[in-house]
Amino acid sequence: MSQSTAFRATALVVEDDPMQREMICVLLEESNYNVIQCESAEAAELVLDKFSNSLALMITDVSLAGRMNGVELAHIATSRNPQLDVVVTSGRALPEPLPRGAKFWSKPWAALDVLREAEWAQTRSATQH
């Protein structure tokens, strides 16, 4: 009798504030996600180069360390994986339009928002794998 391993989705969290990043990561890990975390869009772009098709969810802040912002990163991510669930967060107005299908969460958002999005993205991703 073979044992099957439950599907475990992977999320990319891009946030330069360590406390915010850690909170999101803990919530996602509690939702049975593998989590990759980055402080900058440039670091996240390297992750997307290797893993964009295996990601279920990306949550990014708009204001990040480095030269690229989270909206620009969202455009890159969705161009590499149109099925990726992308959430962009900010306490300010967006500097430019989001890519089609991306969601915007105004800060402060609730932990329940992360948990709901994680469940939705994981269910969607599991049906594609």
For each feature predicted by the language model, list its residue ranges.
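Non-catalytic signal-transmission and effector/linker regions of two-component phosphorelay proteins
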Residues: 1-12, 18-19, 25, 54, ...
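Two-component/phosphorelay signaling modules centered on CheY-like receiver
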Residues: 18-37
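Acidic, metal-coordinating helix/loop segments flanking the phosphotransfer/catalytic sites
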Residues: 37-57
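Acidic catalytic/metal-coordinating carboxylates
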Residues: 40, 68-73
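Short amphipathic alpha-helix used as the core "switch/output" element in two-component signaling
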Residues: 45, 71-83
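Active-site residues of response regulator receiver
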Residues: 61-62
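Short loop/helix-cap segments at secondary-structure boundaries that form the rim of catalytic
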Residues: 92-102
